[in-house]
Amino acid sequence: MTNPIIAFKNVSKVFEDSNTVVLKDINFELEEGKFYTLLGASGSGKSTILNIIAGLLEASTGDIYLDGKRINDVPTNKRDVHTVFQNYALFPHMTVFENVAFPLKLKKMDKKEIQKRVQETLKMVRLEGFEKRAIQKLSGGQRQRVAIARAIINQPKVVLLDEPLSALDLKLRTEMQYELRELQQRLGITFVFVTHDQEEALAMSDWIFVMNEGEIVQSGTPVDIYDEPINHFVATFIGESNILSGKMIEDYLVEFNGKRFEAVDGGMRPNESVQVVIRPEDLQITLPDEGKLQVKVDTQLFRGVHYEIIAYDDLGNEWMIHSTRKAIEGEVIGLDFTPEDIHIMRLNETEEEFDARIEEYVDTDDHEDGLINAIEEERNEENL
């Protein structure tokens, strides 16, 4: 990567009064014009990173760079970034226009230019005609748009978003995901988004940093992280997973549940203990004698687009299955899956070791042919 817009080099943060370590040797580089997400549970350190970028907190050790310049000692108001907070931090006594225009007035910009810039920005966030509206009379989604408009009106190099969608209802939150992503792509400004919501991260991001206990556990594209989680924490934090103990017999051959199965992973020691991950949506229900494994249905819930079925095998392992077909509690069913559906996780593998192994042994060709080409390829394979 050339000329990262933001870089952290060996950054840590310790709150001295409580001797609490909240960030541990954080290193990353962010490319200009991308949508990045810091994803983690409460207390993982994600908001601390955001506040350090903004200048609201100082790093205990390490260096922070913005567009190639070290900014550790640069005050907040001198950094070319803008933060959208969870509560939006709007001025309740001001109108929509006055809120959005506020950063420009601080720069003592010409009134005509302010008028032009505010109108252009409100159009971008679909708030034309709301200039005179009082903040108290806006819906949650409209307040969100005002906060974003104020953040982008100065055309900062980076926009920081600290869980800005968490207060919205589900439908509005989903709509705002589309709007935020589309706006970021149209503006070409780097967005750094903080959330604990895995679905938000997967839906909007170019690149995700998964955080846990002050460390970046794994980073990658949404597809990479979902399909190839590095460890048990990531596999369970990002989506639902069936995780079993297993043994890697050799490259591309794994043993679990007392049986051996073809896999697509390699680069491990013969007979190395591993964990096996199969996603619920990758399990196909078949007749018992046609499945690779047999399980007994225990319970099920209807989730709208699928049934979530809980079943157990003869060894007592719990299996979650997503199926459009309804099961019968107590019946024995077969489970089928392909080698590509099996993901192998080594124990205590670092991200550097993981990335090197994945690059060498796993087919990560993520070229995008589109839906039509994909359908045509499937039909051609069926006709062979």
Swiss-Prot record:
Q: Which organism is it from?
A: Streptococcus agalactiae serotype V (strain ATCC BAA-611 / 2603 V/R)
* Subunit record text: The complex is composed of two ATP-binding proteins (PotA), two transmembrane proteins (PotB and PotC) and a solute-binding protein (PotD).
Quick one: which gene encodes this? potA
Main location, first listed in the record: membrane
What is the role of this chain? Part of the ABC transporter complex PotABCD involved in spermidine/putrescine import. Responsible for energy coupling to the transport system.
Output this protein's name. Spermidine/putrescine import ATP-binding protein PotA
Q: Does Zinc show up as a keyword for this record?
A: no
Q: Which residues form the signal peptide?
A: none
- Reaction equation(s) it catalyzes: ATP + H2O + polyamine-[polyamine-binding protein]Side 1 = ADP + phosphate + polyamineSide 2 + [polyamine-binding protein]Side 1
How is this protein positioned relative to the membrane? Answer: Peripheral membrane protein
**MF terms per GO, please?**
ABC-type polyamine transporter activity; ATP binding; ATP hydrolysis activity
What PROSITE patterns does this protein's entry cite?
A: ABC_TRANSPORTER_1 (PS00211), ABC_TRANSPORTER_2 (PS50893), POTA (PS51305)
What's its EC?
A: 7.6.2.11
Record's Pfam families?
A: ABC_tran, TOBE_2
* Residue numbers binding ATP: G40, A41, S42, G43, S44, G45, K46, S47
